[in-house]
Amino acid sequence: MDPNTVSSFQVDCFLWHVRKQVADQELGDAPFLDRLRRDQKSLRGRGSTLGLNIETATRVGKQIVERILKEESDEALKMTMASAPASRY
């Protein structure tokens, strides 16, 4: 199994968890909530295909994201945000 596939799945699980917390605080609009539901189904399918536990993958994904953020400088983050495409919504 490709390690990048596993890492991508782990990060996707953690980011879904963060988005779920946003929804739980009633901060998401209808398109956000629709994507959240679709992505949950997709993650379940991917987890099954990869034979990975979603809860474990979420914890590892959190560690990956924390490591990246720790290494990321504030200036690089500003540049990344400035170059991100605008949302369609």
UniProtKB/Swiss-Prot annotation:
Record InterPro entries: NS1A (IPR000256), uS15_NS1_RNA-bd_sf (IPR009068)
Keywords from UniProt, A to Z, are: Eukaryotic host gene expression shutoff by virus, Host cytoplasm, Host gene expression shutoff by virus, Host mRNA suppression by virus, Host nucleus, Host-virus interaction, Inhibition of host innate immune response by virus, Inhibition of host pre-mRNA processing by virus, Interferon antiviral system evasion, RNA-binding, Viral immunoevasion
Coiled-coil zones: none
Asked if the record carries the keyword Lipoprotein, the reply is: no
Question: Is DNA repair one of the keywords UniProt gives this record?
Answer: no
Tree of life domain? Viruses
Question: Where's it found, cell-wise?
Answer: Host nucleus; Host cytoplasm
Please report, in chain numbering, the residue ranges of the motif Nuclear localization signal 1: 34-38
Q: What does this protein do?
A: Inhibits post-transcriptional processing of cellular pre-mRNA, by binding and inhibiting two cellular proteins that are required for the 3'-end processing of cellular pre-mRNAs: the 30 kDa cleavage and polyadenylation specificity factor (CPSF4) and the poly(A)-binding protein 2 (PABPN1). This results in the accumulation of unprocessed 3' end pre-mRNAs which can't be exported from the nucleus. Cellular protein synthesis is thereby shut off very early after virus infection.
Tell me which family the UniProt entry assigns to this protein: Belongs to the influenza A viruses NS1 family.
Query: What is the protein named?
Result: Non-structural protein 1
Q: Which organism is it from?
A: Influenza A virus (strain A/RI/5-/1957 H2N2)
